[in-house]
Amino acid sequence: MIDEALFEAEEKMEKAVTVAKDDLGSIRTGRANPGMFNRIGIDYYGAFTPITQLASINVPEARLVVVKPYEASQLGAIETAIRNSDLGVNPSNDGNLIRISVPQLTEERRRELVKQAKSKGEDAKVSVRNVRRKAMDELSRIQKDGEAGEDEVGRAEKELDKTTARYVAQVDELVKHKEAELLEV
């Protein structure tokens, strides 16, 4: 029971870190990057579909992204979704594909994005800590029900604390890396 609780907690913490990676990857830096478009989608036959599944996204130059829809009929919808996103870019449609010139970030916008990255990192750490709290509750329940002794539960709690610290450190590292990437001119 204890091993199951620890394994489940670690799995959930891993998912929280993965979500944090995705969230931080969607924050645009001064360079063109296909990951910028992971969170942008359109209504495609009644279902929200990310544009990464509807088009090929290439980066031929450091500040240029080319989006080529698999279906020409989706060109306008994809262009509108990109324009309405919070990326702050202005796509140009030539009838076959969409070109997006990624402008240089202003100092003010960089600081805004760093705050956003820190906020997303803090959300991920809260998520990891919530998983820890639920696992601790589960360990207490196991001890109370007499399924494990106090020593076993104590060791499991120490192991859980180490695991939590490891995942919180991973999130901190991701945020630090993103911050350095954003502040790099």
Curated annotation (Swiss-Prot):
GO terms for molecular function: ribosomal large subunit binding. Keywords: Cytoplasm, Protein biosynthesis. Pfam families: RRF (PF01765). The keyword Cell membrane does not apply. The keyword Cytoplasm applies. It comes from the Bacteria. One of its GO terms (cellular component) is cytoplasm. SUPFAM superfamilies: Ribosome recycling factor, RRF (SSF55194). It is found in: Cytoplasm. Its main location: cytoplasm. Residues 141-160 are annotated as: Disordered. One of its GO terms (biological process) is translational termination. Responsible for the release of ribosomes from messenger RNA at the termination of protein biosynthesis. May increase the efficiency of translation by recycling ribosomes from one round of translation to another. PANTHER family: MITOCHONDRIAL RIBOSOME RECYCLING FACTOR PSEUDO 1, RIBOSOME RECYCLING FACTOR. Belongs to the RRF family. This is Ribosome-recycling factor. It comes from Rhodococcus jostii (strain RHA1). The lineage of its organism: Bacteria, Bacillati, Actinomycetota, Actinomycetes, Mycobacteriales. The gene is frr.
